């Protein structure tokens, strides 16, 4: 008799996605991060749900409600810090997942890649709106500065900003709508992640060699479920170490001060995972130019498949492009560092150089060296 997991309409979907899924036998731990992102999303939705039970999205009580969660709610401090640091772990996994996709040529699965970029943008929007909710100084001024960027759009810009704010400044209406969107977006992310998986299972996973792996596949369970559990242990260990020993390591001290529209903090900066994009935004003196560069720094991922001229999918056997890839990683780390520094010499110059290098490596150097490598392989 056939097992119910192979015949039952619901169990069959789970079986084909996580149990009997044919998977290349040579995929490394870099393929772990997809499942870890799923776990991160579950952690964020669960902790967020418990926080929403006690939080009040009102300018007069939001800050004190967060203090109440931290002090009076049973394990409220832990739920809050798990949620805040869980966002950081989410972005660590997200960046490593994208990096793996770039290195091993997974971007050639166009549908999966493009849904992934939409997922990245949605996650960034969710994280930004979540950062506004505690209603501290950095929450308020971060919201003011970033939403104000819409005013750079010609003709309709200022109307668009007021429409988003729900008034003439960031106030009660803004906080309420940000809470609403922050609550609903993770469920949209979960739906998009399902579509992401659906498209991935149409083509099957790539593998480190970049070669076709159809003749050499194994079942996902038990081989990769056990392998993923190891990654999960490291993820939970990192998250709980951060939460229990250094909960405020990645947060801004200014956010422990109640939002005050009359007092601007000396350095307005977003959370660490947005600093690279913030550095690109600041490196262009023109407002519209900065906003365009900011948007393009993410959307450039969409043109990477078009700029792939190499005859090989993966970078595994392409040493010159490997050097460029790690130069790009170093460049992004430099931008992240610069984004957290004040706007003064020499940080401005370093930021501008790193911003130019970011686009130059992706648009010019990588396609150029792919063509050179194609020539070298013919010899």
From Swiss-Prot:
<comment type="subunit">
    <text>The cytochrome bc1 complex contains 11 subunits: 3 respiratory subunits (MT-CYB, CYC1 and UQCRFS1), 2 core proteins (UQCRC1 and UQCRC2) and 6 low-molecular weight proteins (UQCRH/QCR6, UQCRB/QCR7, UQCRQ/QCR8, UQCR10/QCR9, UQCR11/QCR10 and a cleavage product of UQCRFS1). This cytochrome bc1 complex then forms a dimer.</text>
</comment>
<feature type="transmembrane region" description="Helical">
    <location>
        <begin position="33"/>
        <end position="53"/>
    </location>
</feature>
<feature type="transmembrane region" description="Helical">
    <location>
        <begin position="320"/>
        <end position="340"/>
    </location>
</feature>
<feature type="transmembrane region" description="Helical">
    <location>
        <begin position="226"/>
        <end position="246"/>
    </location>
</feature>
<feature type="binding site" description="axial binding residue">
    <location>
        <position position="196"/>
    </location>
    <ligand>
        <name>heme b b566</name>
    </ligand>
</feature>
<dbReference type="Pfam" id="PF00032">
    <property type="entry name" value="Cytochrom_B_C"/>
</dbReference>
<dbReference type="GO" id="GO:0006122">
    <property type="term" value="P:mitochondrial electron transport, ubiquinol to cytochrome c"/>
</dbReference>
<feature type="transmembrane region" description="Helical">
    <location>
        <begin position="178"/>
        <end position="198"/>
    </location>
</feature>
<dbReference type="InterPro" id="IPR036150">
    <property type="entry name" value="Cyt_b/b6_C_sf"/>
</dbReference>
<keyword id="KW-0472">Membrane</keyword>
<feature type="transmembrane region" description="Helical">
    <location>
        <begin position="77"/>
        <end position="98"/>
    </location>
</feature>
<dbReference type="GO" id="GO:0045275">
    <property type="term" value="C:respiratory chain complex III"/>
</dbReference>
<comment type="function">
    <text>Component of the ubiquinol-cytochrome c reductase complex (complex III or cytochrome b-c1 complex) that is part of the mitochondrial respiratory chain. The b-c1 complex mediates electron transfer from ubiquinol to cytochrome c. Contributes to the generation of a proton gradient across the mitochondrial membrane that is then used for ATP synthesis.</text>
</comment>
<dbReference type="InterPro" id="IPR016174">
    <property type="entry name" value="Di-haem_cyt_TM"/>
</dbReference>
<keyword id="KW-0813">Transport</keyword>
<feature type="binding site" description="axial binding residue">
    <location>
        <position position="97"/>
    </location>
    <ligand>
        <name>heme b b566</name>
    </ligand>
</feature>
<keyword id="KW-0479">Metal-binding</keyword>
<feature type="transmembrane region" description="Helical">
    <location>
        <begin position="288"/>
        <end position="308"/>
    </location>
</feature>
<dbReference type="InterPro" id="IPR005798">
    <property type="entry name" value="Cyt_b/b6_C"/>
</dbReference>
<keyword id="KW-0679">Respiratory chain</keyword>
<dbReference type="InterPro" id="IPR048259">
    <property type="entry name" value="Cytochrome_b_N_euk/bac"/>
</dbReference>
<dbReference type="InterPro" id="IPR027387">
    <property type="entry name" value="Cytb/b6-like_sf"/>
</dbReference>
<keyword id="KW-0999">Mitochondrion inner membrane</keyword>
<feature type="binding site">
    <location>
        <position position="201"/>
    </location>
    <ligand>
        <name>a ubiquinone</name>
    </ligand>
</feature>
<comment type="similarity">
    <text>Belongs to the cytochrome b family.</text>
</comment>
<keyword id="KW-0408">Iron</keyword>
<protein>
    <recommendedName>
        <fullName>Cytochrome b</fullName>
    </recommendedName>
</protein>
<dbReference type="GO" id="GO:0046872">
    <property type="term" value="F:metal ion binding"/>
</dbReference>
<dbReference type="InterPro" id="IPR030689">
    <property type="entry name" value="Cytochrome_b"/>
</dbReference>
<dbReference type="InterPro" id="IPR005797">
    <property type="entry name" value="Cyt_b/b6_N"/>
</dbReference>
<dbReference type="Pfam" id="PF00033">
    <property type="entry name" value="Cytochrome_B"/>
</dbReference>
<keyword id="KW-0812">Transmembrane</keyword>
<feature type="transmembrane region" description="Helical">
    <location>
        <begin position="347"/>
        <end position="367"/>
    </location>
</feature>
<keyword id="KW-0249">Electron transport</keyword>
<keyword id="KW-0830">Ubiquinone</keyword>
<dbReference type="GO" id="GO:0005743">
    <property type="term" value="C:mitochondrial inner membrane"/>
</dbReference>
<feature type="binding site" description="axial binding residue">
    <location>
        <position position="83"/>
    </location>
    <ligand>
        <name>heme b b562</name>
    </ligand>
</feature>
<keyword id="KW-1133">Transmembrane helix</keyword>
<dbReference type="InterPro" id="IPR048260">
    <property type="entry name" value="Cytochrome_b_C_euk/bac"/>
</dbReference>
<feature type="binding site" description="axial binding residue">
    <location>
        <position position="182"/>
    </location>
    <ligand>
        <name>heme b b562</name>
    </ligand>
</feature>
<dbReference type="GO" id="GO:0008121">
    <property type="term" value="F:ubiquinol-cytochrome-c reductase activity"/>
</dbReference>
<feature type="transmembrane region" description="Helical">
    <location>
        <begin position="113"/>
        <end position="133"/>
    </location>
</feature>
């Amino acid at each position: 008799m056939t097992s119910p997991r192979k015949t039952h309409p619901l169990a069959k979907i789970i079986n084909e996605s996580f149990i009997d899924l044919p998977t290349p036998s040579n995929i490394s731990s870099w393929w772990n991060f997809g499942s870890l992102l799923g776990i991160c999303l579950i952690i964020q939705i669960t902790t967020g749900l418990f926080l929403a039970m006690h939080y009040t999205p009102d300018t007069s009580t939001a800050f004190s409600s967060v203090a109440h969660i931290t002090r009076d709610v049973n394990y409220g401090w832990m739920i809050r810090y798990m949620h805040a640091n869980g966002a950081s772990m989410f972005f660590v996994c997200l960046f490593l997942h994208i990096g793996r996709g770039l290195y091993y040529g997974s971007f050639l699965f166009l549908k999966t890649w493009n849904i992934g970029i939409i997922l990245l943008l949605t996650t960034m929007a969710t994280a930004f709106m979540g950062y506004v909710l505690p209603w501290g100084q950095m929450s308020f001024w971060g919201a003011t500065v970033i939403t104000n960027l819409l005013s750079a759009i010609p003709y309709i810009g200022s109307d668009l900003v007021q429409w988003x704010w729900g008034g003439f400044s960031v106030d009660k209406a803004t906080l309420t709508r940000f809470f609403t969107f922050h609550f609903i977006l993770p469920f949209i992310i979960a739906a998009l992640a399902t579509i992401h998986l659906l498209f991935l299972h149409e083509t099957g996973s790539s593998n480190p060699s970049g070669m076709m792996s159809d003749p050499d596949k194994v079942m996902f369970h038990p081989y990769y479920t056990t392998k993923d559990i190891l990654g999960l242990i490291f993820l939970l260990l990192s998250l709980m170490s951060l939460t229990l020993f250094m909960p405020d390591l990645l947060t801004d001290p200014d956010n422990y001060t109640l939002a005050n529209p009359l007092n601007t903090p000396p350095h307005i900066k977003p959370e660490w995972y947005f600093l690279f994009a913030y550095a690109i935004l600041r490196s262009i003196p023109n407002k519209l130019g900065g906003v365009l560069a900011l948007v393009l720094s993410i959307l450039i991922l969409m043109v990477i498949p078009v700029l792939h001229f190499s005859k090989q999918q993966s970078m595994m056997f392409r040493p010159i492009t490997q050097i460029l890839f790690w130069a790009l990683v170093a460049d992004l780390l430099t931008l992240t560092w610069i984004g957290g520094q004040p706007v003064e010499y020499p940080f401005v110059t370093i930021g501008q150089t790193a911003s130019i290098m970011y686009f130059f490596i992706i648009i010019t150097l990588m396609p150029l060296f792919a063509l050179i490598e194609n020539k070298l392989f013919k010899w």
